[in-house]
């Protein structure tokens, strides 16, 4: 019997309900003007009923081709993010020990109504050196402590302190409703219009004060309490790509008397964990108790804050403060030292901000917190904050260098040098204007994270060179040795292309060190991996990506190098141990600097394999983690590899560098391939995406780039540890360069499941 329309709808809803009960959600997309809720409310009600039955709560009204494209991208992005869970970690020491605490961020989408919950756990390291990561055994969980705090500032228990930024008067302001005005016009009449329309134009049941209070943590207007706003299981939003930063007392490698006095004065300041979340805030949690000390809402997320209150947000997830904060010690213009937090929003926005966190205990009111906000920088050429800033001392002064990220207005690569105290632009470099032949202006581009290095070999010298990659495969070189920025010299040292001529995007920061023949041969080795994973389309991209090691002489190159100028090393697959562990072996073609300009390795073992995390150079070993994402947007998966590469040749070392078979020892018999004992270059890490490298040994070489900030290592020892060599400072007659051996450590990274 043919079903009536009503029966057909009933049948569909029954099927959708069954699928949802089985854990399969269905996204409902309407097509054409006929499903526009303003024109056809009956159709809208029908599609909404189907969406509720399907488990997503709302349908997508694709009333035109553009909306259809955007809706499909939103759906795929939600599905992709929903397959992830654990994000990143921080530790309270440079190596794991019994007294160490590991801080692990997390995001969950499987709570009630899939409300994009975040968490940050503090885990102990037990007497065996093992991290106990059971949530029930956590020292604290930030989601729980934040729920227990009072959303009203100054109230008990632990009222929240939240600030934001007013770009009209250029300073921080408390994120509070101004009770002195009766107008629903925002935080205060003078600043309301600058904080976005979400706080200015609402109907009676969605007014600005209710929205602001909701964002602060008031749950009275949530649907579960009779209101119209989205339900939240916990106040803390999902923490996806923001790496938590642990900050205790100042510890930069700086021996000046003024800095030593500053470090001594603040040596016992309470440790704090800083992390961004997709609830619109950067959070500062007390590292001992887990209580939120303060939160900051950067200007780059203003325009999307209103989406957080929508009951349909759970199926239309957005990023907010998704960048990784970092803290560095800065000497201000009055010669006083300050610890400054620098942060951005990652995929959530286009601003870069700075907060003075010298004394966390002083930021105990919203007025004090607002005064500590130094600046919040935006620019027409600043894109989404995928580029991490780096502080460096140059001949012209101390500046914060950053690439402009992606999806900027003009979609070109720019390098910024900002005053770290004021946020003022010291200089802005238009790279394509400097080298027009390097850019295809018809294709979107942007500058990734930069490194700022001292290529002299003298640890006391100024930083003089910037290296950064872009989406078109250019490895840029900016000589900043001249104190006059208009005299900085821009060039491209490498144009990364695969064997078919396809550009190889560079989305992670390069790393640099002195070349293997220094000091007899002057110049730097620069290493970079290629590949991107920024959107859904990247999942299915199978272009070959590569790892490059390029020699950069003091004068640079008149024309960019290409792969034809470099020595190729070829990968092969193999296995080690029982049960077999997949490893990679590599050729050992001769590379001699400066006759050869470097080397490259094509990542050919796994289709779609790419590098999206910055490499690490330690004691002559270049350590690179790669990933092969699953092309299925609905599935977890992907395979990661770790490569331990001889930085001088792009080949493997003559002895094993890692415990490939997992037996707890590094031996020729157990960790090489075949009867001829071929030393592997890399090992498969398993399913999932791995973060950057964490090394646990204490051998600290003199390496580039120079380190600035509390996370910097101590100076190198006068006698190197056993089996570890390091580069000596040029001109030091008592120091002889040692043989460079790789670190013998199996644990090289923390598990990170990410897009």
Listing of model-derived features with the role each one plays in the protein:
Residues 1-25:
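Exposed acidic/Ser/Thr-rich ligand/metal-binding surfaces
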Residues 2-3, 36-41:
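Short, flexible/disordered intra-domain loops and linkers
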């Amino acid at each position: 019997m043919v079903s009536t329309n009503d029966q057909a709808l009933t049948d569909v809803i029954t099927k959708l309900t069954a699928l949802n009960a089985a854990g399969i959600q269905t996204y409902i997309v309407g097509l054409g003007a006929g499903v526009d809720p303003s024109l056809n409310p009956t159709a809208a009600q029908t599609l909404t009923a189907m969406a509720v039955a399907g488990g997503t709560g709302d349908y997508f009204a694709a009333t035109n081709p553009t909306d259809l494209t955007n809706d499909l991208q939103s759906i795929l992005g939600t599905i992709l993010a929903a397959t992830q869970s654990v994000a990143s970690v921080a530790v309270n020491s440079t190596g794991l020990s019994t007294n160490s605490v590991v801080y692990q961020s997390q995001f969950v989408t499987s709570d009630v109504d899939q409300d994009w919950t975040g968490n940050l756990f503090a885990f102990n390291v037990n007497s065996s050196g093992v991290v106990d990561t059971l949530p029930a055994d956590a020292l604290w969980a930030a989601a729980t402590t934040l729920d227990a705090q009072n959303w009203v500032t100054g109230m008990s228990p632990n009222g929240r302190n939240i600030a934001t930024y007013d770009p009209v008067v250029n300073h921080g302001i408390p994120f509070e409703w101004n009770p002195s005005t009766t107008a629903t016009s925002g935080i205060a009449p003078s600043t309301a219009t600058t904080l976005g329309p979400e706080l200015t134009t609402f109907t009676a049941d969605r007014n600005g004060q209710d929205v602001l209070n909701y964002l602060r943590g008031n749950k009275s207007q949530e649907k579960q309490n009779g209101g119209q706003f989205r339900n939240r299981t916990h106040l803390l939003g999902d923490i996806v790509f923001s790496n938590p930063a642990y900050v205790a007392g100042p510890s930069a490698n700086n021996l000046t008397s003024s800095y030593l006095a500053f470090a001594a004065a603040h040596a016992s300041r309470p440790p704090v964990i800083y992390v961004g979340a997709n609830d619109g805030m950067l959070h500062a949690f007390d590292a001992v108790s887990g209580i939120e000390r303060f939160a900051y809402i950067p200007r780059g997320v203003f325009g999307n804050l209103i989406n957080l209150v929508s009951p349909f947000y759970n199926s239309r997830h957005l990023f907010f403060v998704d960048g990784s904060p970092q803290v560095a010690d800065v000497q201000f213009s009055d010669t006083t030292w300050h610890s400054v937090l620098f942060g951005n929003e990652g995929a959530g926005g286009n601003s870069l901000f700075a907060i003075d966190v010298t004394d966390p205990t002083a930021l105990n009111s919203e007025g004090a917190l607002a005064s500590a906000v130094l600046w919040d920088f935006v620019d027409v050429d600043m894109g989404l904050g995928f580029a991490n800033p780096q502080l460096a001392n140059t001949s012209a002064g101390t500046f914060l260098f950053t690439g402009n990220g992606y999806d900027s207005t003009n979609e070109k690569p720019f390098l910024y040098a900002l005053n770290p105290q004021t946020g003022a632009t010291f200089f802005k470099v238009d790279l394509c204007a400097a080298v027009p032949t390097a850019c295809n202006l018809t294709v979107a581009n942007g500058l990734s994270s930069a490194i700022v290095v001292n290529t002299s070999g003298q640890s006391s010298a100024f930083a003089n060179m910037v290296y950064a990659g872009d989406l078109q495969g250019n490895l840029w070189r900016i000589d900043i040795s001249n104190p006059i920025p208009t005299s900085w010299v821009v060039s491209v040292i490498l144009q990364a292309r695969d064997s078919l001529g396809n550009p190889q995007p560079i989305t992670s920061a390069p790393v640099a060190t002195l070349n293997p023949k220094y000091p007899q041969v002057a110049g730097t080795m620069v290493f970079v991996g290629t590949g991107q994973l920024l959107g859904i389309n990247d999942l299915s991209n199978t272009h070959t990506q590569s790892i490059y090691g390029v020699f950069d002489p003091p004068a640079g190159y008149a024309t960019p190098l290409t792969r034809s100028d470099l020595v190729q090393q070829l990968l092969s697959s193999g296995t080690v141990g029982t049960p077999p562990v997949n490893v990679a072996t590599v050729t050992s073609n001769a590379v001699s600097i400066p006759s050869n300009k470097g080397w490259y390795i094509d990542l050919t073992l796994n289709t779609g394999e790419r590098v999206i995390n910055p490499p690490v150079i330690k004691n002559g070993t270049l350590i690179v983690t790669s990933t092969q994402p699953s092309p299925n947007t609905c599935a977890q998966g992907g395979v990661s590899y770790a490569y331990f590469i001889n930085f001088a040749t792009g080949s493997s070392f003559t002895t094993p560098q890692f415990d490939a078979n997992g037996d707890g020892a590094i031996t020729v018999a157990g960790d090489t391939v075949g009867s001829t004992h071929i030393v592997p270059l890399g090992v498969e890490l398993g399913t999932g995406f791995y973060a950057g490298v964490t090394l646990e040994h204490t051998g600290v070489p003199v390496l580039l780039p120079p380190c600035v900030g509390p996370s910097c290592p101590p100076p190198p020892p006068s006698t190197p540890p056993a089996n570890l060599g390091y580069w000596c400072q040029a001109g030091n007659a008592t120091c002889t360069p040692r043989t460079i051996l790789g670190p013998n450590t199996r644990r090289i990274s923390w598990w990170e499941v990410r897009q």
